């Protein structure tokens, strides 16, 4: 749980931008814990009555509270019978203020009823302010924006398309603006990745035990576990990317027997998944490029040469007619449908970024995103390069809390070394199967993997290991395929 009612500091409000708290006698206040609402970087000054009793003296310097939907500490260390809290900004949203004595016990002001929204949920202050009770890492952007979609507020995080945050907003609508509320949808998408990976591997290998093995690898992968338990959009786009490649595999497998109504339905579903991936995060565009290469490669191999057409008993003119009809379906499924989904995702922003014109809103946001990702270059202790991800050179620290028991609570994003390091030789073996053994499944996985990794070679913004998430899912499929090839398909073992 987390505080829900908000007290607004407003300079034109009846209370103004200040709060005067009174106590029954003098009390020693060690610190104040402030659960900040949806506006970051709020500035406060605490003060106490001066010795003459005719004014106020500030306690220390102005304090900046950085993190939204998070408990922010304010050091006080003063004995007083009154405490003034002044907001230095035009407005500030505070969901709860908890004053603590030197032993960590809460102190409730005698006039708390004057500011009911700030002191009505004292019981929600946890003994240890870990990630279970507050936002962490990019949740301060994505969860906040999901809540802004729910409440129709001005959208803050506009550096990614809206759909991922819209999905997160569904959890907030049901469970409120709490850690569970903004994380539950991500957990659901993480869970759904397991049956999709099972079905994908089952289709590739036609083996139940190998499909189960691949699904278990995803279950026990640390990055999948972490991203499924935090409120960011990465597991959502990861799910749609995995689904996009799976559905394209089904499409190509079906096209071997010609284009049927079943094939058309699969193409439409494939286009919907691709559109959802793009509308969640731009990394979905890489997957769209990947399935385009896979589709064109398949069509060239099947119809691009006279020998291929002869094998199918098809003349050149018949092949042209067939491909022309297929092209119309592909344009509808892989261009129009994704475009509609992408543009429609901006309806969740309402009129906030435009003048009621969803196309204008979408276009302006594309320019903003492009500018942001071009300019986002900064030093970060957990940043890493694309060639460092596979061997987990630098994990990402999401949250760190020192507990009162002397222990620490840490959330970190990185892969399971057993799985990821095993996937490195599996990658090279898959390339061998593709190039030397002419294995088409291996080729499909290699092209899928390359489409998700190669764009990062040309991106010079600051990046982190979680950008490798989609690649790691494909590498797990490579592990399963290598195992299948080694044990069940290699004629040398029969």
Regions found by a protein language model. Give the residues of each.
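Hydrophobic, aromatic-rich transmembrane alpha-helices
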Residues: 402-439
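Transmembrane-helix motifs of polytopic, lipid-linked glycan transferases
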Residues: 180, 184-205, 243-247, 425, ...
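Membrane-interface transmembrane helices that cradle and orient dolichyl/undecaprenyl
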Residues: 205, 244-266, 277, 296-306, ...
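Membrane-interface alpha helices of multi-pass inner-membrane proteins
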Residues: 263-281, 452-453
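Aromatic-rich transmembrane-lumenal/periplasmic boundary elements in polytopic membrane proteins
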Residues: 101-146, 319, 329, 338-391
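Transmembrane-helix signature of polytopic, membrane-embedded enzymes
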Residues: 177, 192, 197-220, 239, ...
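Loop-to-helix entry region of an early transmembrane alpha helix in multi-pass inner-membrane enzymes
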Residues: 158-168, 174-195, 227, 231, ...
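Short acidic/glycine- and proline-prone juxtamembrane loop motifs at membrane-interface regions
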Residues: 182, 223-236, 280-283
